[in-house]
C-alpha cells in the first residue's frame, strides 16, 4: 500500500503516526495532551495485512528538489501524478514486488491525487492498481 497525504505541505507522517503505522502518537485519553504525547505500539497497524510505503511528494514533509527552482516542475496535477507513478514503479521493480497487488491510499487532497496516480500507473507504467483507499478525500474542489 502506497500512502500519501494531501497538500499543501501535509506530510505522510499523519497517516504513519496516526493511522496505519506500527507505532502511533498517543495524546492521552482526551486526545489533546500534545505536551506529553508518547509513541506506543499500534494494535491496529496495517502491517498485519499489507506492506506500507509512505511517500511525501515534492513540497510535502521533508521532500524537496535539489535545486529549489526545479520544484515548480512537480506542482501540476498531471506531473505530480506521473512522478508518483514512476516512483511506485521503480520501488516495486527494485524490491521485487512487481507481482504484488498495489493499493493507493490518499488522505484529503491525497484522495484526489490517488485517482490521478492510479491512472498514471495504468497508462504510463503499465501497472494496474488493485484498489484505492480514500481517507477523508477531497472529491470536489477548485484547484
Show where each model-derived region lies.
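Phosphate/oxyanion-binding active-site loops and adjacent basic polyanion-contact surfaces
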Residues: 73-85, 109-114
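Loop/turn elements at helix/coil->beta-strand transitions in domains of secreted/extracellular proteins
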Residues: 48-51, 99-101, 128-130
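N-terminal cap/lid subdomain of alpha/beta-hydrolase-fold enzymes
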Residues: 1-73
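Active-site nucleophile loop of the alpha/beta-hydrolase fold
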Residues: 57, 130-143
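Short glycine-enriched nucleophile-adjacent loop
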Residues: 111-123, 132
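Alpha/beta-hydrolase-fold catalytic nucleophile elbow
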Residues: 5, 105, 133-136
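Alpha/beta-hydrolase fold nucleophile elbow
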Residues: 96-109
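Active-site catalytic microenvironments for nucleophilic, acid-base chemistry
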Residues: 90, 94, 120-124
Amino acid at each position: 500500500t502506497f500512502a500519501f497525504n494531501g497538500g499543501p505541505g501535509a506530510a505522510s507522517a499523519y497517516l504513519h503516526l496516526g493511522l496505519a503505522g506500527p507505532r502511533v502518537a498517543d495524546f492521552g485519553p482526551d486526545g489533546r495532551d500534545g505536551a506529553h504525547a508518547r509513541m506506543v505500539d499500534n494494535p491496529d497497524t496495517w502491517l498485519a495485512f499489507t506492506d506500507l510505503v509512505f511517500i511525501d511528494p515534492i513540497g510535502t514533509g521533508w521532500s524537496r528538489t535539489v535545486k529549489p527552482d526545479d520544484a515548480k516542475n512537480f506542482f501540476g496535477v498531471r506531473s505530480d501524478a506521473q512522478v508518483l507513478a514512476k516512483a511506485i514503479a521503480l520501488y516495486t521493480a527494485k524490491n521485487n514486488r512487481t507481482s504484488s497487488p498495489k493499493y493507493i491510499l490518499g488522505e484529503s487532497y491525497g484522495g484526489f491525487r490517488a485517482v490521478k496516480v492510479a491512472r498514471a500507473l495504468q497508462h504510463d507504467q503499465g501497472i494496474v492498481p488493485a484498489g484505492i483507499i480514500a481517507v477523508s478525500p477531497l472529491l470536489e474542489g477548485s484547484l
